[in-house]
């Protein structure tokens, strides 16, 4: 049964990740990729160790969901507190922001897995797009079983559905620092605002299938926020409906989001990479 549900390439890649004690150690964000890797490793009979980094750059709701998902798999995740805002050269790193942050965070994780191979959820698709954080992973010897097995998002979702893993259609919600331009270092209060506002949006019935990001794109206007909505996720929703939700958002988080506009865009990810 296992052979038919999980391709041999992925079985082999996970086996390569396991130590002598059959433990697979995973840097676990709680996103689809690392959650799938944990699920498959558990399904294949390995002991799974999950290391989850929590801090102001992560929405508290994301950490809570990551913990709940891990426990649903029968795994108690290890929570590691980290604050990227304390990295002195992060703001000056420019487009290498993710590299600097990941290098710092994964050094923390490696200190806790000195006798283990540390894995992450990088997938095949990540290899063909701009991902400066991958350089840090390569330098630190982080192992990516999904990428090695040739698994991209399509294969991950399809296999997750076959294995009856909950929420195989889970959408990405990257680090909150990505809501700000390169070179801008937000404070904790603004990160909390961003997380709370996005949580509020996700809870609105109209936003059930909406893909969006709340971004602060203009350093000269620190209180100007833009709600970026992916065009294909509108699924029959009119721009007027989205504007009405945005007005409720402004009222809920007044005065912090009084200067909020809505932008519908073809591609949601990589906004600041396209802008530079």
Which residue ranges define each predicted feature?
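ATP-dependent adenylation/nucleotidyltransferase module used to activate substrates
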Residues: 1-162, 247-257, 264-276
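Flexible glycine/acidic-rich beta-alpha junction loops that bind and position SAM and/or redox cofactors
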Residues: 172-184, 220-224, 267-271
